[in-house]
Swiss-Prot record:
GO cellular component, one term: ribonucleoprotein complex
UniProt cross-references to PROSITE patterns, sorted A to Z: RIBOSOMAL_L20
Gene Ontology terms for molecular function: rRNA binding; structural constituent of ribosome
Protein's name according to its UniProt entry: Large ribosomal subunit protein bL20
UniProt-listed GO biological process terms: ribosomal large subunit assembly; translation
Top-level division of the source organism's lineage: Bacteria
Species annotation: Francisella tularensis subsp. novicida (strain U112)
Family matches, as InterPro entries: Ribosomal_bL20, RIBOSOMAL_L20_CS, Ribosomal_protein_bL20_C
Record CDD domains: Ribosomal_L20
Family the entry assigns: Belongs to the bacterial ribosomal protein bL20 family.
Amino acid sequence: MSRVKRGVTARARHKKVLNQAKGYYGARSRVYRVAKQAVIKAGQYAYRDRKVKKRTFRSLWIVRINAAARQHDISYSQLINGLNKAGIELDRKALAELAVYNKDAFAAVVEKAKAALA
């Protein structure tokens, strides 16, 4: 049986990791052992932050809706309560888009919510 030398596969594996670490600072982009750790950690951060991104955007939408709602003399929580009572099923992303880009439509939605609360 012939002997298997692993130079080619090792080089390919190292090259793959070092390419993923391109743009990292110092040894993290040059030394395989350090680069491998950096790439693994980067993957962990990326995975975690894909989940965090959803929370962050939801809170951003709520802040925007609250700011726009208060211009119409109603708080965020009252607005959401009014929308639920009125049977209007707009999600927070859509409400935030209306609040920022289509103020007239948002005002109409707020009036419906106020009417449902009264």
